[in-house]
Amino acid sequence: MAAKEIKYDSVARDKVMKGVDTLANAVKVTLGPRGRNVVIEKAWGGPTITKDGVTVAKEIELEDKFENMGAQMVREVASKTSDMAGDGTTTATILAQAIYREGTKLAAAGMNPMSLKRGIDKSVQLVIDELKKISKDIRDKKEITQVGTISANNDNTIGEIISEAMEKVGKEGVITVEEAKGMETTLEIVEGMQFDRGYVSPYFVTDPEKMEVVMEDPYILLYDKKISVMQDLVPILEQIARSGRPMLIVSEDLEGEALATLVVNNIRGTLKCAAVKAPGFGDRRKAMLEDIAILTGGKVVSEELGIKLDSITLTDLGTCKRLHITKDNTTIVDGAGSQADIEGRVKQIRTQIEETTSDYDREKLQERLAKLVGGVAVIKVGAATEIEMKEKKARVEDALHATRAAVEEGIVPGGGVALLRTLPALAGMDLPDDERPGLNIVKRAVEEPMRQIAANAGFEGSIVVEKVKENTGNFGFNADTEKYVDMMEAGIIDPTKVVRFALQNAASVASLLLTTEAMIAEAPKKKGAGMPGGMPPDMGDMEY
């Protein structure tokens, strides 16, 4: 076992602080409408230019192991906020840095980190309760456009396309983002269905860079049991191989000999195929398989119905125009099922929704209905160069997540105003004396996002914060126009869910780091002495 190096107390916290600062200082320059770009070198191809906080955070790895621990913890804040709310990564990083920085000062002055943590936790909970009071539900297309625009770094085109997509497929509909062939960013609405099951083996992927399976005009085999023996599949596979078209198997599971044979055939190119597990469980799985069958014009192969796997023909299989599978999701686009059958199924599900008494069943039935009716909206992102394309696509994906979050939990004034408006409630909070410093840490931290937005726009953050604090309601600083405005009226809004997760995740990690008393890392290896100079002995008389 390699020797370990251990650091304690303030020495450990100082090392962590250095790592946190290194990462946060690189990320926070991207915040706000006047946020700067960060250029990231890539081992292959050209550099990436981005204004996305989580992209910057993911690239940072520090040489010092103790500093790197701090940086990685804050990177986790950005990454988790992105996964849960889709946006707010830079805000979360700034809040984590502010809470930890103020906390380390107080811990160094002799205060108990556990008391600080208790004070921080209680204060954060109060801020979240206040945010919920300030929050306002989204009612119209204009507000959806505004949220999308802000999250896409003030790109109004993206905001409008997202709101149009949501209007077309509904708030529960599926929206995907793809790269366009030209320079225009466009929206396509396609009938389709998405379910939360990915490929059973990564050897099925057709695009190794994105780890995705994309198929055109595939046959779709739907089976309600497990497939492990190849013998049952051989007759239908031979028919499909002769047709030259790809194939998708949707079954309870695919394993053993059957999976191995399909993978080998796929790699060799004999038969392009993929397999996914059937969505849902029990009776719901059977119902969802039937939904897919109706959408694709196929049949569910079920021994209960007297149909055996080794006796089916191509007419029993479903088809669709396009199939898109990731490790988590499968999207069937433009199924070949008849419109009359689909409408009949929709009517049946609607009747079940009306009759059910269980909220859970109703929710699941509505999900199935959305999959059958909603269709898929495809946003095709266009740009002049590949570098710009990747950056723009990342912004569209961020904006899409943020817009969904806004529809879910409502919106608050943006530009850091919502957090600032929780200060009066924090000031009136009653805490024990040993926990009050934790409250003061949060009071200082909630000002930080607005300070940074102002600083990135070339203004003195403290002056802007004081001016906004003097006023009430939605009054705030528009860094884009450099004016003080009503943030809601100006369309500068944040999804409540994004602000909430940013603060919760930041406080959680910063509190953990504050209460860290020891850090252990592998000791750096001592380099051995180099080879001595000079000529080896007995070689002086060699001729050259």
Curated annotation (Swiss-Prot):
This is Chaperonin GroEL 1. It catalyses: ATP + H2O + a folded polypeptide = ADP + phosphate + an unfolded polypeptide. GO terms for molecular function: ATP binding; ATP-dependent protein folding chaperone; isomerase activity; unfolded protein binding. The gene is groEL1. Keywords: ATP-binding, Chaperone, Cytoplasm, Isomerase, Nucleotide-binding. It is found in: Cytoplasm. It comes from the Bacteria. PROSITE patterns: CHAPERONINS_CPN60. NCBIfam families: GroEL, PRK00013.1, PRK12849.1, PRK12850.1, PRK12851.1. It comes from Syntrophus aciditrophicus (strain SB). GO terms for biological process: protein refolding.
